[in-house]
Structure formats: C-alpha cells, structure tokens
From Swiss-Prot:
Biased segments, Polar residues type: 34-45
Composition bias, Pro residues: 59-69
Phenotype upon loss of function: RNAi-mediated knockdown does not cause defects in somatic gonad development. RNAi-mediated knockdown in a ehn-3 rd2 mutant background enhances the defects in gonadal development in the ehn-3 single mutant.
GO CC terms, sorted: nucleus
GO molecular function ontology, one term from the record: DNA-binding transcription factor activity
Similarity section: Belongs to the Ikaros C2H2-type zinc-finger protein family.
Expression sites by tissue: Expressed in the somatic gonad, hypodermis and cells in the head and tail. Expressed in amphid and phasmid sheath glia, amphid and phasmid socket glia, and in neurons in the head.
Zinc finger (C2H2-type): 5-27, 103-125, 133-155, 161-183, 190-215, 223-246, 420-442, 448-472
Sorted UniProt keywords: Metal-binding, Nucleus, Repeat, Transcription, Transcription regulation, Zinc, Zinc-finger
Name of the protein in its database record: Zinc finger protein ztf-16
Locations listed in the record: Nucleus
Feature: compositional bias, Basic and acidic residues: 244-259, 404-413
Annotated GO biological process: gonad development; positive regulation of gene expression; regulation of transcription by RNA polymerase II
Length: 480
C-alpha cells in the first residue's frame, strides 16, 4: 500500500507523490508572490498504514520520527515539534480578502481562528499528556473540565445565553458578549470604564481611541473597572466587561420620578391616629417596627409619609382576622352584627362564615354580660336616688339641670373604661368590645398560647405575628 502524504498547510492528502509534489510547488509559488514572507516552508507528514491522517488517537502524540518519501525535498525531512506545528499547521484558503485562517490541532479535533488559542491548546497537550478531558462525541480534548462541559453543550443544542437586545441565543457567554457589542456600538454617550476617569464620548470609536492613547493598559500596568474594581490587562477586555456587565443599567432610559399612587379612601376616613385605627392595623405597625431592619440608606424613601399610605404588600385572608371570634351568630344572638362597622374599620360586608371553638364565644359572651350588668347597675344607681336624697331633693328644674351637667362632664371612671390596656401585649384599646375580642385570643393558662389553634408562641411579638398571619380556617373547619 502506498504511503499517505499530507500537506500541513491546507490538509491536502494523497498517495501519489507526484501530485503531492506539485501541490507543494503551488504553495511555494504563492508564498514567493506574497509580499509578507512570514510563512515558513511547508512541511509534510507521512503516516504509516496503521495511522489515520484525519482523526489520530486523542491521547497520542505525533510520530517522533515520521518516515519521509524517498523523493521528497530536504525541507520535508526534518522533525516536527510542537512549536513548529503551532506556526505551520493551518488550513488556509488564500486569495480572498478578509478570510479567516483556521488552525487545526493534530492531536484532536480542536479548531480555532486565533493563533494564540491554538498555541495555548498545544501547550496544554504538552503539559497534560494523558490527562486531557475528552468529549465523548467528537473526541475533542481540553485541559480543563469546565471547558469540556461548555463544549459538550454544543452537542446538546442548548443555548443558555441570550442577547438582551435582539433575543438571539448563544452557546458561550463570551460569544454573547461579543454579539452584544454590535448593538452597544450603535448607541451614544459612552463612559470611560477606567476607574477615576470621568470622560464621556459620543461615539464608540472615540472611546476606544481614548483607551489606547490615554490609558496605557498592559500586563505591567493593569486598569480596574470603575464599578467593581476588577483588574484587566487588556483595554478591549475591560471595555467588553464594562459595557456588557454594568452599562446595561446606564444605557437604559431613565424613568421619571412620578408620584406614588396613594391609597384610595372615602371622605369619612379617619386620620391615622391610634385611637381610630383597627386592631389589625395596630398589630401590623407594631410587628413591622419590631422586625424590619433599620433603614440606613438615605436614598430610600420607605420611611416617608407617602410610603406609609401605600397598601401593605402582604395578603390578608380576611377583612379583619380578629372577627374570627364573631362567627357563631346563634351563640352571640346578633352580638357581632350590632358592632358598629366604622369601629372595626371594615366595609359593610357579611361576616366570614368561619367556625371557631365554642369556648371563645362563651368567654366573649360572658364578659359582655358582665359588662352589661355593670353598666346597668351603675345606671340604676344614678337614676334611682336614695331615700335621703329624696327627702332633701331640690326642685325638679334644679335636678334636671344637675343631671344634664353630670352627663356633659365626663367622670374619671368613664375615661378609664374607654382606655383599656392588655396586660400581656401592652396594646391600648379605646373600645371595650375590641378589648374583649383580643382578650379571648389569649389562653387562660398561658397568655402567649393561641386560644384558636393552640400554637405556643413564647412572647408577645411572635404571638402578634401568629394572630395576624396564621390561617385558622383549617382548624375551624376540623372543629366544625
């Protein structure tokens, strides 16, 4: 069998040596006509019968002593090393202006258009002999496992990186960044990416000229990004990093500072005073002030009065979770419907059909009866005078005048009855009914144990949070 002759410059292979010699002479004539003269003389690799020229073994090295053809010239007879392959092993189609040169690795199927990448790849073959990571599909080898996995995604067809301008997808992140630069260059108003440089340019070419002339960025004099202080030894890489990583927020159109939408309220809405807020709003404010971290950002407007008027972001399962105690209408005999709706600060809607435990209703009903009996006895004592008072009673007009004055002037006892404080939570209630509803949520033995579901909270803030956000409808359904 004739020996196979392969051209290292363009990959041409033939077993007829006369054809191969004419092919080599054609390359030499082209090199003599070219003015560059940088291309070295072509070299020939002759492979044995048991070695394939197109796809050699992935982990094998080139033959240390290839056998040349007996009629070959002198420039085809010397040894081929790794450095010589780096400079001469290319596949080139001359004659077309601007066409890229494709470099082919002799050990695996790695190809690239950049000579520096090929040089690094061949050096990796030399350093990691027998330890390269190989793709199981195309047998291409890599010195790093991450690069092999990145290459493996090409075979899967998944393109994880998307251009934010045209939504085109890419296999590799650097390819997506290079593509994004084609969109970024068409814009205007470019900032210099070098830290402590506030220069701005209207055109992208002017910015690149500024980086090359003003900032001499090199390996000995690296420059840092003005946003993240990452160091770069190449101006092009710095510009690519800055305009694809950080400049997306700057290049986007700035939004106008429009006033925030305020919470809608009717004309009869009460001011934000603790006396006029519902229990839910008081609990929400107390929990928010305790659990929210301190605001150290001066630019944040979350503490402004306008922000407080925005409705809370967390959802509420019911209009007022404390109305869970008012669901059993038969035991209360219409007690829940008699509570004024403005006092509860909720719309005029029917109460939620929740099924609470009967003990809560009994406690509220008993306390309400006691409160009603105390008010009745006090009113009877005021309206029914004693016999001594009847004997020394003033005239009818004077007694009526004194009664009206007593009604107009509030007594200290009445003020104390209106302002009731929970001894466990420290919350102030300006209505006895709301205090009784809140009191029924505490268990008798443990004040911080929820009387609705039996959850042990431990302290007042956890108890308050549990009362506001816990979903007691499931326990109510099971108890029913």
């Amino acid at each position: 069998m004739d020996e196979l002759n392969a051209c290292t410059e363009c990959g041409f292979t033939t077993t007829v040596f006369s054809e191969f010699q004419g092919h080599i002479e054609k390359h030499e004539n082209e090199h003599s006509r070219s003015s560059s003269g940088e291309m070295s003389n072509s070299q020939t690799i002759e492979w044995g019968d048991g070695i394939q020229s197109s796809t050699p073994s992935p982990r094998s090295t080139p033959p240390s002593d290839p056998t040349p053809s007996p009629d070959s010239d002198e420039h085809l007879e010397h040894h081929i090393s790794i450095t010589e392959i780096t400079n001469t092993l290319i596949k080139k189609e001359p004659g077309t202006k601007g066409q890229k040169t494709v470099h082919v690795c002799p050990h695996c199927n790695f190809t690239t258009c950049m000579s520096q990448h090929m040089k690094s790849h061949l050096e990796a073959h030399e350093r990691h002999q027998g330890q390269m990571y190989q793709c199981d599909i195309c047998k291409m080898q890599f010195s790093q496992k991450a690069n092999m996995h990145r290459h493996r995604m090409r075979h899967s067809g998944v393109k994880p990186y998307e251009c934010r301008f045209c939504k085109k997808r890419f296999f590799r992140k650097d390819q997506m960044q290079e593509h994004s630069m084609t969109h970024i260059k068409t814009g205007f108003g470019f900032d210099c990416p070098v830290s402590q440089c506030n220069m701005q340019f209207s055109q992208h070419n002017a910015l690149r000229a500024h980086l090359e002339e003003t900032h001499t960025i090199s390996s000995t004099n690296p420059a840092s990004c003005k946003r993240c202080n990452l160091m770069f030894a190449n101006s092009r890489r710095l510009l690519l990093h800055f305009q694809t990583r950080h400049d997306d927020s700057e290049s986007s159109p700035k939004k106008e500072n429009t006033p925030k939408r305020k919470k809608l309220s009717n004309g009869n809405a009460l001011p934000m005073d603790p006396a006029n807020m519902s229990i839910t709003e008081q609990l929400q404010r107390m929990v928010k002030s305790e659990f929210s971290p301190p605001n150290t950002d001066t630019s944040d407007n979350s503490t402004s009065s306008e922000f407080d008027k925005i409705p809370p972001s967390f959802p509420m399962a019911n209009p007022d979770i404390l109305l869970m105690c008012l669901n059993q209408m038969n035991q209360f005999n219409g007690f829940g419907e008699n509570i004024p709706r403005p006092m509860l600060n909720i719309p005029n809607i029917p109460l939620p059909a929740l099924h609470n435990i009967p003990a809560v209703a009994a406690i509220v009903k008993q306390d309400q009866v006691q409160l009603w009996s105390e008010q009745t006895s006090s009113s009877v004592s005021v309206s029914a005078p004693s016999p001594s008072e009847q004997s020394h009673s003033p005239p009818a007009n004077e007694s009526s005048l004194s009664l009206t004055e007593k009604e107009k002037s509030p007594t200290p006892e009445k003020e104390d009855e209106e302002n009731v404080e929970c001894c466990h939570c420290g919350m102030m209630f300006y209505d006895n009914t709301m205090y009784l509803l809140h009191k029924s949520l505490h268990s008798d033995g443990d004040p911080f144990k929820c009387a609705l579901c039996g959850t042990q909270c431990g302290e007042k803030y956890m108890f308050t949070t549990h009362v506001i956000f816990a979903d007691h409808s499931t326990q109510a359904t099971t108890s029913a």
